[in-house]
Amino acid sequence: MEEFTAPYAGTYKLQCWGAQGGDNSGKGGYSEGIWKSTIDKNALYVCVGQVGGIYGFPSYNNKPDNITWFDVGLCGGGSTNITTTNRGELKNFASDDRRNEVLIVAGGGGSCEWNGQGGAGGGFDGKDGNPTTTGGRKGKGGSQNSGGITGVLPGDTSVNGMFGVGGYGYAYSDGYKRNDYGAQGGGGWYGGGGASYAGAAGGGSSYIGGVTGGKTIAGDNTDTKQPTPDGKSEQVGQSGDGACVITQLSFN
């Protein structure tokens, strides 16, 4: 988490890119909007999502509370968000009385185990995963009101996406002698659903409810491309880690 202090009262353009998921993953979404500071030295707080990994620690800004390590599984990309208070990762704003502290969110991409494609980060809705392995399960993208549904085989454990965090599924593996996780959904306003065996997880949704003149572009949108974080070009989705740019547009 980083603190940004707006030096002067005025209008600021906020831009966020979510992170890409792990392996054959969806790319991160993009959000932008205008925020007005009425005072000098006004603080904002930024969490930049971390790219999803393979068989490892959950990504920053996409960490389930009860998971410290994804055994035999893929991690979804973390969302990127800007808030008016310092509470850390987006999941800490889940209660209704804290959500108005969130200005903007860009959803992270879902991961994919084996073959297929994880869903891209939103957009208002994250995109569904697309598994191509026979029997592979599909995670749904997160929306503005709920987390994506996690797809699992009968008897597997399923945790759906939730506010700020992607879902996941798993089964106990006799061969590994521990839980075998599949693909985790991307983080977001609401996280994408995960998938168990050979599955593709959904992307997390984005949010622009705390800014004016906002727009959001999904990580797979080829008709309306995202700007690159350096502002020099355009792209179809954010690869790797997320990003954030804050630009002062005018002074009061």
Feature-to-residue mapping (PLM):
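Extended extracellular/luminal ectodomain segments enriched in beta-structured repeat modules
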Residues: 6-13, 38-43
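Extracellular interaction modules
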Residues: 97-99, 234-243
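Secretome/extracellular-domain signature
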Residues: 26-137
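Contiguous ligand/interfacial binding patches
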Residues: 163, 194-239
